[in-house]
């Protein structure tokens, strides 16, 4: 049996969602299924998933993860929470939340770029700690996108087009960055592609660190212990990593084709 922390209120929506799915009756499944399918069809008709998660919901997810799974990475969260909770409906987590919990989600206003190997609690703390963002709704891959898509139809072309169109439509990208000495996103091909898409479509890009990282970064800059120009010079898409080597090759090809002179 799972032992739940006393620091996690039972009213936490991510705890509640997990509990309600585990106790779901056939009648509830029959009631929820057509509603979820309607939301999924709307995403498909739109061509791109644009649902965002509110800052308060991000804070609730951070609290859930901090209390029960503090060592999870973003990848762990995807496979051990999202995929398990949404398995019976094969839908996005936000569409499931909207139907099962009745929490209305709005169109995203900020596209969040991050590394999948990030500690989930720390990543969510960065987003939840954003100032002047109480009215923002965040596009976060693991929550917004249906994680059950067939890879034969949702291949590189689908993902690259989705990122490009989402970034263009949403209008603002926030890149969560740490550690500052060698930020993981700047070594990942897909993250660099998202930065490129933001620049290519002339959209706003903000870089966000948590308080601890920001203090260390500012201190290193002030004391001259950090070579900013050298840091930037190391950013190289050709040397970046990707889960699939062919993705990296395709990303390089797309970027070169869109840049004048290659």
Residue ranges of predicted features:
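The feature represents the membrane-entry module of six-transmembrane cation channels
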Residues: 1-262
């Amino acid at each position: 049996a799972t032992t739940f922390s006393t620091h996690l209120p039972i009213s936490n929506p991510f705890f509640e969602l997990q509990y309600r799915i585990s106790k779901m009756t056939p009648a509830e499944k029959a009631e929820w299924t057509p509603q979820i399918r309607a939301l999924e069809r709307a995403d498909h008709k739109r061509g791109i998933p644009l649902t965002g998660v509110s800052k308060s919901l991000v804070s609730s997810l951070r609290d859930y993860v901090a209390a029960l799974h503090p060592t999870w990475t973003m990848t762990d969260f995807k496979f051990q929470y999202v995929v398990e909770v949404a398995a019976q409906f094969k839908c996005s987590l936000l569409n499931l939340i909207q139907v099962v919990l009745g929490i209305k989600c709005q169109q995203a206003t900020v596209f969040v770029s991050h590394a999948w190997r990030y500690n989930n609690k720390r990543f969510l703390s960065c987003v939840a700690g954003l100032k002047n963002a109480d009215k923002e709704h965040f596009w976060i891959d693991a929550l917004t996108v249906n994680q059950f898509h067939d890879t034969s139809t949702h291949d590189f072309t689908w993902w690259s087009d989705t990122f490009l169109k989402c970034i263009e439509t949403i209008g603002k990208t926030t890149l969560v960055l740490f550690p500052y000495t060698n930020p993981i996103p700047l070594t990942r091909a897909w993250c660099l592609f998202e930065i490129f898409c933001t620049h290519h479509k002339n959209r706003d890009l903000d870089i966000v660190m948590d308080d601890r990282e920001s203090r260390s970064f500012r201190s290193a800059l002030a004391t001259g212990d950090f070579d900013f120009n050298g840091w930037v010079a190391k950013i190289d898409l050709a040397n970046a990593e990707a889960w699939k080597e062919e993705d990296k090759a395709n990303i390089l090809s797309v970027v070169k084709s869109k840049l004048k002179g290659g």
